[in-house]
Regions:
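Short beta-strand-loop/turn "lid" adjacent to the catalytic site in phosphate-handling enzymes
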Residues: 1-17, 40-43, 48-53
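A conserved helix-loop-beta module that forms one wall/lid of the active-site cleft
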Residues: 28-46
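Small/polar loops that bind or transfer phosphate-bearing groups
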Residues: 43, 241, 265
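Active-site core segments that coordinate phosphate-bearing ligands/cofactors
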Residues: 2-3, 15-25, 29-32, 53-236, ...
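Short glycine-enriched loop/turn motifs at secondary-structure junctions
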Residues: 8-10, 35, 124
Length: 324
């Protein structure tokens, strides 16, 4: 077969030079790795060739099937499938979240390194300048534990439960290492609150509010950091992936960041994969036209900021708690 290394995946190895578009020979030498251990780079939209005859089902009489490289890193495909325009930040929201923006060139400065932002490659050698953060893992672990305690929280009831809950002036650093592993999540939350001298929630509804507001405020911190690093303001935040169905988190995020939040496609990764093929075959002339088609053909919701003054005060307290 044709063994190649697709660019968006290669860029996540920390061994790929995103400026020279090849593996970093100096880094490889420092690891005593010959460049020859890595196959030739293939770019999204390029062809691996055609399926061999033995791969077809018996009796197949159709045309030979061409195998194209897509953005094989799922977030790269998801970002391509994001129907955003102008200066926007994206949040690929799943078990974990990735928040960033698109750049034409990598940003390889000390400030980016200290902030732990990475330059990963997207379609057309664009740069996905982003940082990983907590996603739906934390809230799902809390829900799972309440279910084990005989207090299940159906997804359909989450908004109702949060609306019914009392406000809580406590906050979590959702990226604290204590929240990274599964199991006993309620106890981990309680221990964190004890350690930071904060009030614990009184019931499952308040736990939901606590986690969601902490995630939203964490996104604000990331967006503010991103804006400083790239030296421009983000007009909006576009959330793609399964996590964008969390309407409470979407609204809390709009409140926290004081700008519009827009939901993009839930299946952005699949759409991005398809767009590579459409562009390759001339259905769309470029990324701009492809994204316009996504915008026209998928449904989205917009969330406008509410209670901004209240959320600004929450953010001040949040920053004091997490000490960042």
């Amino acid at each position: 077969g044709s063994i190649r290394m697709e660019e968006t995946n290669a860029s996540t190895t920390s061994l790929y030079d995103s400026r020279k578009k090849k593996m970093d020979e100096e880094l490889l030498a420092s690891l005593s790795l010959p460049a020859s251990v890595f196959p030739e780079i293939i770019y999204p939209g390029e062809s691996y060739g055609y399926l061999r005859k033995e791969a077809y089902p018996d009796g197949y009489k159709g045309k030979p099937v061409e195998v194209l490289a897509c953005c094989s890193h799922d977030t790269a495909s998801a970002v391509l499938g994001t129907d955003g325009f102008g200066q926007f930040a994206y949040l690929s929201s799943g078990t974990w979240s990735l928040l960033g923006t698109e750049l034409k060139e990598p940003l390889l400065d000390e400030a980016s390194r200290n902030a732990n932002f990475t330059n990963e490659i997207g379609y057309g050698s664009s740069v996905r300048y982003l940082k990983n953060t907590m996603g739906m893992f934390l809230i799902n672990e809390v829900r799972k534990e309440f279910a084990n305690k005989g207090k299940p929280i159906p997804v359909s009831k989450i908004k109702e439960y949060v609306d019914e809950s009392e406000d809580i002036d406590s906050y979590l650093d959702v990226d604290d290492p204590c929240f990274e592993t599964p199991g006993e999540m309620i106890e981990k939350v309680d221990r964190y609150l004890e350690r930071t001298g904060q009030m614990k929630p009184t019931d499952e509804k308040q736990y939901l509010r606590l986690v969601y507001q902490s995630m939203a405020l964490s996104y604000r911190l990331l967006i503010e950091t991103l804006e400083k690093l790239v030296s421009h303001r983000m007009d909006s935040l576009i959330i793609v992936g399964g996590g964008n169905q969390a309407v409470v988190l979407n609204q809390f995020t709009a409140n926290a960041i004081n700008r519009k939040v827009v939901t993009g496609p839930v299946e952005a990764t699949v759409i991005g994969n398809s767009l590579v093929q459409f562009i390759r075959h001339g259905v769309f002339k470029d990324v701009k036209e492809a994204r316009e088609a996504v915008y026209r053909s998928t449904s989205s919701l917009s969330y406008l900021p509410l209670d901004v003054d209240i959320w600004n005060k929450k953010y001040e307290k949040f920053r004091k708690v997490i000490k960042r």
